[in-house]
Amino acid sequence: SNFKLNMLYNEIEEVLRSVYDPEIPVNIVDLGLVYKLEVGEAGKVKIIMTLTAPGCPVAGDIVAEVQQKTEAVEGVTDVYVHLTFDPPWNREMMTEEAKLELGFL
C-alpha cells in the first residue's frame, strides 16, 4: 500500500540522516547529497546520490554506509546505490537548516 511505502520512505530518510559527510559536519540529506530516493513495491530501494567533491577519498565508505544502513531498515529487500556527479553538488542544494548551521545564511 502507499501508506506502507511512505512509512518505509520516511524511515529510510531518517536513517540517511545518520550518515555524515566527512568534510562538512552535516548529514547527507540536509546537505542535499541524496538526489533521489525511490522505494518500490517489494521493498526495493534505489538511491541516487552525490558527494561534495569528486575524488573524495572516503567516497566508497559513504556509499557502503548508505547501503548498509538502508539494508538494515525493516521491510527493505534490495538496495541499489548509484553515485553520480551530474549535476555536480553545490551549496544551493542544502536545506535552510544546513545553511544556517554552517553559517551560510
Where are these regions (language model features)?
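Domain-level signature for proteins that mediate thiol-based redox and metal-cofactor handling
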Residues: F3-L105
